[in-house]
Regions:
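Histidine-centered, transition-metal-coordinating active-site segments
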Residues: 1-99, 107, 139-144, 148-167, ...
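Basic, low-complexity intrinsically disordered segments
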Residues: 103
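Broad structural signal for hydrophobic residues in well-ordered alpha-helices, predominantly aliphatic
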Residues: 99-100, 132
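Short active-site segment of divalent metal-dependent hydrolases/proteases
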Residues: 116, 120-124, 241
């Protein structure tokens, strides 16, 4: 399939030598896709492998659930015009496509990575991510103590972790369903690798361990940044979208720090020449006139324009060096190396960290969401049969306790799971279930898949009482 991309001004332009081509061994899938192979061999393929990946992501259940997952604040509790994880994803995709087009990278690959990059995110944003990682790694002292007292089990020894980029890949290779010939969505490696590396591979300096991912050589985990130009572009686009749009949402959502944020943005105008904004612009007047979107748009436009100039320079230098490998790419040309020296963006990041994330409303909501998720986890650990049947049926497939697996098979019910064990058998095997890393991972998968509203409803079903 030809390596060209359609440009908005109506011409076709071949991909840059550093862009990831649409054909080659790198686009092979784990499971052979007979339909795709047949169409390519017959010369009737209407989509590139990366377009197929993009379409599969869009039609996945995990993608649809993003609409009710938090970006920064609770969805449904504040201004409904505030971004969710889904709208953030679409905006990252738009920025990534825009940058890819300008540097002649593979737009389809950039879009596929962008659309899938947050599929593994938890309810309640990064708070949910921290709750699950603290639980699995043993940093949650309360849950760790409970497990030690009830089951004489130190979860720290399991060396399990949770991080949303790893979980996104797990969703795509293991958890999504709907195809008869393979598990997951059977995506190409450049898409999965770009999703995995759109953010850091460590948590607080500690490497993240995920079974089925760390040992996969195709992900090149010895290299912290993406092996494709397009993956690096998505990491850049994610940072730009997150920082700039979080600031806009804080103003639109009328955070208590809104006034301080406006003062900081006013100072920003004095420090930097921003395209289409004069030095005499009054930020408060723009907010009052509901023109903050235009203000943020001008800032994003400037950050992108200057980032593209830097990326082009890096690409030109690399092309001159005679580098032949298009994939995997072992040079960082479009991620932190671009944004780290971008003074305007770094000032925006300071504003986000100091006055958006560090905020009275957000702190209260984070406390609430942390409490809800910890209580849900405690309930499942107290009695695993409180998990729904589809999770328990999955556990039957992956259970790593041989005697228990045999006992379940002998139950005779279809489909079989631990719910149908006798009371005595369940009590005997419950400690082994809780200590089974396969169970702990599946339980975390289920909690991570919840939307904000579903998690709140689950808490109420488990504990009763008033709406929390």
């Amino acid at each position: 399939m030809e390596d060209w991309i359609p440009l908005t001004y109506g011409k076709n332009c071949r991909l840059d030598p550093l862009a990831t081509p649409n054909s080659g061994s790198h686009v092979e899938r784990k499971y052979q896709d007979k339909k795709e192979k047949k169409e390519i061999e017959a010369g009737i393929a209407t989509r590139t492998p990366f377009q197929i990946d993009k379409d599969r992501i869009i039609y996945s259940k995990a993608f649809r659930r993003l609409i009710h997952k938090t970006q920064v604040c609770f969805t449904g509790e504040m201004n409904e015009h505030i971004r969710t994880r889904l709208t953030h994803t679409l905006e990252v995709s738009q920025i990534a496509r825009s940058i890819a087009r300008q540097v002649h990278a593979n737009e389809d690959l950039a879009e596929a990575i962008a659309l899938g990059h947050d599929l593994g995110h938890t309810p309640f944003g990064h708070t949910g991510e921290k709750v699950l990682n603290d639980f699995l790694s043993g940093k949650d002292e309360g849950i760790k103590k409970k497990l030690l007292e009830k089951y004489e089990f130190d979860i720290t020894e399991m060396k399990l972790h949770f991080k949303h980029n790893f979980q996104s890949v797990r969703v795509l290779i293991e958890l999504e369903e709907g195809y008869k010939d393979f598990k997951g969505l059977n995506l190409t490696c450049p898409v999965l690798e770009g999703i995995l590396k759109h953010t850091k591979l460590e948590s607080n300096g500690q490497p993240i361990v995920y079974e089925g991912i760390n040992e996969n050589g195709a992900f090149h985990l010895d290299q912290k940044f993406s092996c494709s130009l397009e993956g690096q572009i998505v990491a850049l686009a994610d940072e730009i979208a997150q920082v700039c749009h979080d600031i806009e949402d804080a103003i639109e959502g009328n955070y208590d720090s809104k006034e301080i944020i406006c003062i900081q943005l006013q100072r920003l105008i004095g420090e930097f020449d921003i395209n289409d904004l004069g030095k005499n612009v009054d930020v408060k007047e723009m907010v009052a006139a509901r023109q903050i979107k235009y203000f943020i748009s001008c800032i994003i436009g400037q950050v992108i324009s200057e980032a593209v100039i830097e990326i082009r320079k890096n690409m030109k230098d690399l092309n001159k060096s005679g580098l032949k490998a298009k994939y995997p790419l072992n040079k960082e040309i479009a991620t932190d190396c671009v944004l780290d020296k971008h003074k305007l963006f770094q000032r925006l990041k300071e504003i986000e960290n100091n006055f958006v994330i560090n905020n009275y409303m957000i702190d209260r909501m984070n406390g609430k969401s942390s409490f809800v998720l910890r209580q849900i986890i405690k309930a499942y650990l107290t009695n695993p049969k409180q998990l729904p049947d589809h999770v328990l049926e999955l556990y039957t497939e992956v259970c790593s306790v041989p005697a228990l697996k045999d006992k379940i098979r002998k139950i005779g019910s279809t489909p079989a799971n631990i719910r149908y064990l006798s009371k005595k058998d369940f009590e005997n095997y419950q400690p082994a279930i809780i200590k089974d890393r396969a169970f702990l991972r599946l339980m975390s998968d289920y909690v991570a898949s919840m939307t904000d509203l579903y998690a709140l409803q689950e808490y109420q079903k488990l504990y009763g009482g008033e709406s929390i």
